[in-house]
């Protein structure tokens, strides 16, 4: 039977290695989840920007058609410029956002955060 010195406290090597292995496993599980959350947040932000572009379009179209005394095609053109323009700059939708309208799709993209979202959208028809 061996006597231990008084005040000699500490962890054994096996205990330290066990803790490091457990931390490694937790990190291996948590890090991918974190990146998935970042991608999901970026896509949700892109979804909100695309929806905002469509809302701007609809508001401008309604305002021009109902209150501006313009024809339907003039109101459509004004709404396109308001919501999409030729190449919207970052100040209109926040930092680094690009909103495009092609065919029947509105796409919001932000390369800095990696978010992209596309919404199907059809313009009102003019008679």
Task: Describe the predicted segments one by one.
Residues 1-11:
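N-terminal leader/signal peptides at the extreme start of proteins
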Residues 62-115:
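Extracellular/periplasmic head regions of type IV pilus-like filament subunits
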Residues 41-68:
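Membrane-proximal N-terminal amphipathic helix
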């Amino acid at each position: 039977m061996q006597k231990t010195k008084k005040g000699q406290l500490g962890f054994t090597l096996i205990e330290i290695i066990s803790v490091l292995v457990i931390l490694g496993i937790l990190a291996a599980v948590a890090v991918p989840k974190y990146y998935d959350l970042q991608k999901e947040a970026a896509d949700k932000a892109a979804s909100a920007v695309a929806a905002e572009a469509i809302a701007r379009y609809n508001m401008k179209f309604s305002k021009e058609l109902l209150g501006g005394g313009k024809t339907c095609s003039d109101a459509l053109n004004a709404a396109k410029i308001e919501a999409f323009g030729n190449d919207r700059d970052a100040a209109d939708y926040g930092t680094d956002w690009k909103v495009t309208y092609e065919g029947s799709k509105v796409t919001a993209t932000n390369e800095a955060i990696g978010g992209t979202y596309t919404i199907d959208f059809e313009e009102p028809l003019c008679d």
